[in-house]
A protein has these predicted regions:
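A composition/biophysics-driven feature that prefers long, compositionally simple stretches
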Residues: 1-184
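Active-site cores enriched in adjacent His and Asp/Glu residues with nearby glycine-rich loops
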Residues: 19-36, 176-225
Length: 225
């Protein structure tokens, strides 16, 4: 994670580019492989990460443009979480890492958004790319999944692009770190590409490097020898 002030500065910059209403950033949920507790490697939504920074499932972020406040919705660690993973930080502790003071349980999100809709407030969101997120937004906002792209906020999309296309020094530093990792992955693959070596061996080594030095690859490795 970056410094907490960076995330609050990003949210402040987004407010300055937007009009009024509420910006809704749904985080990603775990995706099961073959039963609920056996999940694929978790990947947080990039926009949620950019503005709220927490790489954890089952969270949602709100930026209230009219009140100038930020809210993080998420549940406290369960007893199962503590048994399997040991002591876990509270929602307040997690939120403090990204300069958010207002935290609420995920069960309160539906009422919060419903009250905003009934008050005539605009809810800004970007088009979802995952089916589970589309279903969640559909239920929360009362919009059929097929119409979510129609109701998605073009104003928000343009504002996010305007912010994210300009990289600050700390972002460039992180990008350069990942360039070094990518270089190691590619040069390792080149050295291994010899007669008798099969693709899965090279693939496995490349994936291992990605997880050793970072958080895995941003897209599946494309490899042919």
């Amino acid at each position: 994670m970056l410094k907490s002030q960076i995330y609050s500065n990003r949210r402040k910059a987004l407010r300055e580019l937007m009009g009024n209403g509420i910006i809704f950033f749904p985080g990603n949920v775990e995706a099961p492989m073959n039963y609920p507790a056996n999940t694929y490697h978790f990947r947080q939504d990039s926009n949620f990460l950019y503005f709220f920074g927490l790489n954890r499932a089952d969270l949602a972020g709100i930026i209230d443009l009219d009140k100038g406040t930020d809210i993080l919705f998420g549940d406290e660690p369960s007893m199962d979480d503590i048994i399997w993973m040991g002591p876990q930080p509270s929602m307040k502790e997690r939120a403090s890492l990204v300069n958010v003071s207002d935290t609420r349980s995920l069960s309160q999100l539906a009422t919060y958004l419903s009250d905003a809709i009934h008050a005539g407030r605009k809810i800004h969101f970007v088009p979802p790319y995952r089916a589970d997120t589309a279903q969640w937004i559909s239920i929360l906002l009362g919009i059929k999944p097929m119409f979510l792209k129609v109701y998605a906020s073009l104003e928000l999309m343009k504002a996010i692009v305007q912010l994210r296309e300009i990289k600050k020094a700390e972002e460039i530093e992180e990008i350069e770190k990942m360039i070094s990792v990518a270089s190691l992955m590619h040069t390792t693959a080149m050295r291994m590409a010899k007669p008798g070596v099969i693709e899965r061996q090279i693939f496995g080594r490349m994936e291992g490097i990605a997880f050793e030095y970072a958080n895995g690859t941003s897209f599946p490795t494309i490899l042919s020898i």
